[in-house]
């Protein structure tokens, strides 16, 4: 492992996937699948359009969210690309407890700015404390007042906070951040 890391310049994105036994870089697509999930792949309707599996998915998403439009994407980064190409752009700022790397990239590609507002304890790595993924609520409100709510298309709460070590966010912090966002009429995007 040491030689692999050294060869990669200590950059985890340069480590070939076949050299990784357990992926601790991300939680995307690395979980074990059940026998039923694998069987579902084998039974999958691979029609170009009108696949039965899409309608099952669409119905479930509509029931959960109440939203009519459902656009499936292969991963979160593709959804981010669509979202930020629509709501992003120069002069806009996206606030977050901490942007995930692909989220930040998609925000910045749109011409907008990404600002992280983690609680101070999040950066004290040796300190053991619950909910180090929380947003700093005072900093959030101060930044909204500084920039003006009209320049902030949405606030992003990343749960769990991957960029800061997978730290959890408390429900209390999420509720209070939501109240601040509602007060300033800024949509809260739960990632």
Please report, for each region that a protein language model flagged, where it lies by residue:
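N-terminal glycine-rich, Lys/His-bearing helix-loop that initiates the first secondary-structure elements
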Residues: 1-37
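Conserved N-terminal alpha-helix of the aminotransferase class I/II PLP-enzyme fold
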Residues: 28-78, 98-99
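Conserved beta-loop-alpha segment that forms the PLP phosphate-binding cup at the N-terminus of a helix
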Residues: 68-93, 103-105
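Short hydrophobic alpha-helical segments of the AMP-binding
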Residues: 61, 107, 181
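Short glycine/serine/threonine/alanine-rich loop segments
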Residues: 67, 112, 186
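Active-site phosphate-binding strand-loop segment of PLP-dependent enzymes
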Residues: 125-190
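Substrate-binding/gating loop at the entrance of the active-site cleft, primarily
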Residues: 96-121
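General beta-strand structural signal in soluble alpha/beta enzymes
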Residues: 71-74, 96, 116-117, 157, ...
């Amino acid at each position: 492992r040491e030689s692999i890391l050294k060869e990669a310049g200590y950059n985890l994105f340069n480590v070939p996937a076949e050299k990784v036994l357990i992926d601790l870089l991300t939680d995307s697509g690395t979980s074990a699948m059940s026998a039923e999930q694998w069987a579902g792949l084998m039974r999958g309707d691979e029609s170009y359009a009108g696949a039965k599996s899409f309608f099952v998915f669409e119905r479930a998403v509509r029931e959960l969210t109440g939203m009519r439009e459902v656009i499936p994407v292969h991963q979160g980064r593709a959804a981010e690309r669509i979202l930020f190409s629509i709501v992003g752009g120069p002069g806009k700022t996206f606030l977050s407890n901490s942007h995930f790397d692909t989220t930040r990239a998609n925000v910045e590609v749109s011409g907008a700015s990404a600002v992280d507002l983690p609680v101070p304890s999040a950066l004290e790595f040796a300190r053991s404390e619950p909910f180090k993924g929380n947003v700093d609520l005072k900093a959030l409100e101060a930044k909204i007042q500084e920039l003006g709510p009209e320049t902030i298309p949405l606030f992003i709460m990343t749960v769990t906070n991957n960029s800061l070590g997978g730290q959890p966010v408390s429900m209390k912090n999420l509720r209070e951040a939501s109240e601040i966002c509602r007060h300033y009429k800024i949509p809260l995007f739960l990632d």
